[in-house]
């Protein structure tokens, strides 16, 4: 039964001065009273649809990127409801993390209180947008009733052998004596707080074995046909599956010492002129000669202060030193020097590479810098020359200077040399991955505690499930100094071992916030479950997510971790599917008008630019560059959503941000275009106000979601044209909102329909006009939900517009009785005539020759030729 809505006596609001704030506030209260946005219990055979935006970090202030993300998802959710689906459209908060901890330190406040305050502020801002979110399912990752289950899932992964602890490199601040996140290290490698030069240290860290799923993560990308190709490519490159060979180089003078390298180019083995170890490689200490000890130690100390990014940057010089050892090239017995270098990383492959400078650009640069031999072993195809002396040849070719393997193609050489090496025991085929296991340890306070206890007797002991959650202590010292804040809380750290009862201590690391965001989409399906993180049957009914919307910046980490979690939980029989998101839409950035001084790189506030036609720096007078860049405070180009809503209303903000650009493209903010959308909505108000029910029908009149039932034979030409425009709009907008979603062109079609109705409603029968307006209002409802609700009420619609069905095309309305035919004479267009849509060529020729156009331009001549393009034109050639 449809619940009653406000009476039509309130309809005067739309015909009076448009006051979006009053109108939108009124309808938002009504929707809340009615509970329209709650997720329904799906009826038998009713299709479920899960629409989800990537949930935000609660900074406390909404920005235009948020608005675009959530409005896109809201339109999709509203359309699916009107199509008859049971829709789940939730929202939550990615609430743990470094920003809240830093804010708490700076302001001397509790990060939990700070975060809850921000959540309340942002929810109020989101509510103003008219989003149809089921807030009953709201989750915050920092709340105990959520992170209890993050810990539960960690223990599941631990039980499955997917969580483990090992030593890893971290950023260490030697002054504050604490671990820093990468974001806390500036471009010069210094701590953001103390200014100290950051060191690289080895600490025990927790990892998840995401590499166990490397093949599944890359192979299953082919099944994600609803994902952008760009995202799938980015993930494949990040996983970085490489097929090659593992080669063993024996250390000269030592019987049992072997350096193992992985290479994707075993065909170039004869061209190896040195072997390079990572400075952290365990063999460096053992193989370094006494003569090189000082140089090697100094180099290792230098490298320990550099980040991985600095060590591997393409524009950085490739530094290294020899360690005084030699290895034997197994394919030809040559002795090769062993070096350590900054560009080789210990945790990639075996931490050792063979240097083939003629056929690897990085090796080429290193060899040139250190005067190492460069031997060509691959000749360029179809060329007598091997390659340009100024660079490495990394492409395919024919093997030369390779002994028995000369003349083979590179692909043949890879197989032949690997096979030969395998028969001799020094080579084997190998698949290598760029992907590393996921380091989840953070030496921070504001994160999910890792539910592990360390016991001297029992080792690593999981916290019993009945003792979850392991909660964060409150009123803790957050000075940002002295290592992990949790490690300072002895009352919290010291516990008894659950197994032996002896003294033990808690794990003081907290989890990476990506742990919390890797499963939140599952909790939304069963948010109040107090026994488990979610019920398998319920989750399997709603998931995978039908439509996921978020920024391209999450293409790798968040989306990859969520896919890993889903696969791991599937293998633990906790869920029945292997991929979390069926369809992914990555919306573009919102960019603002930006003024930049190209001489010094500074950004200038638009408020300081006096002449927009000739913008100049107010201090130097330098001419300013005008461009659009991602909105940010530092560029003075941000637009506050609250200001836009206060002035124009949420419907205008929604319409602009949906209309300005296709959803996946960057959007350039333009105040004039915002004003244009506001004027369009005002035109719609005037259009609706121009429709008046006849006096005889007024008391019982009610607009319907049903199509017109009058026979087309009984319709006037005006009525036929109005119905055709109406149903063409249904066809076009339905297409725009299906598959490859194009919200901007859908709004264009809305504009076309409204223009076609303008000034014509009083020229057709009430039933025809009412059908057209019913369609118009229903088509606009997902985009401008407040005004659509107001219009529906004014037109005496029953219930809420958002409870109505999506318009259905009447194919008969699209059938053309007549068409416009172009008449050409001597190939030039001379005019058009109306002809029956089903006229054949003979009839078209006859109608064309009898037309006034032909009489005028042929001047009594008979055409020598008549060229007919059915449905398009007739060309008369005298």
Swiss-Prot record:
Motif ('KMSKS' region): 630-634
EC category: ligase
Cellular compartments annotated: Cytoplasm
Residues annotated for ATP binding in this entry: 633
Residues passing through the membrane, by range: none
Intervals of motif 'HIGH' region: 56-66
Any single Gene Ontology cellular-component annotation: cytosol
InterPro entries reported for this sequence: aa-tRNA-synth_I_CS, aa-tRNA-synth_Ia, Leu-tRNA-ligase, Leu_tRNA-synth_edit, M/V/L/I-tRNA-synth_anticd-bd, Methionyl/Leucyl_tRNA_Synth, Rossmann-like_a/b/a_fold, tRNAsynth_Ia_anticodon-bd
Pfam families linked to this entry: Anticodon_1, tRNA-synt_1, tRNA-synt_1_2, tRNA-synt_1g
Keywords for this protein: Aminoacyl-tRNA synthetase, ATP-binding, Cytoplasm, Ligase, Nucleotide-binding, Protein biosynthesis
Predominant cellular place of this UniProt entry's protein: cytoplasm
EC number per UniProt: 6.1.1.4
Keyword Cytoplasm in annotation: yes
GO terms, molecular function: aminoacyl-tRNA deacylase activity; ATP binding; leucine-tRNA ligase activity
Chemical reaction(s) catalysed: tRNA(Leu) + L-leucine + ATP = L-leucyl-tRNA(Leu) + AMP + diphosphate
GO terms for biological process, alphabetical: leucyl-tRNA aminoacylation
Family: Belongs to the class-I aminoacyl-tRNA synthetase family.
NCBIfam families: leuS_bact (TIGR00396)
HAMAP family xrefs: Leu_tRNA_synth_B
Name of the protein described by the UniProt record: Leucine--tRNA ligase
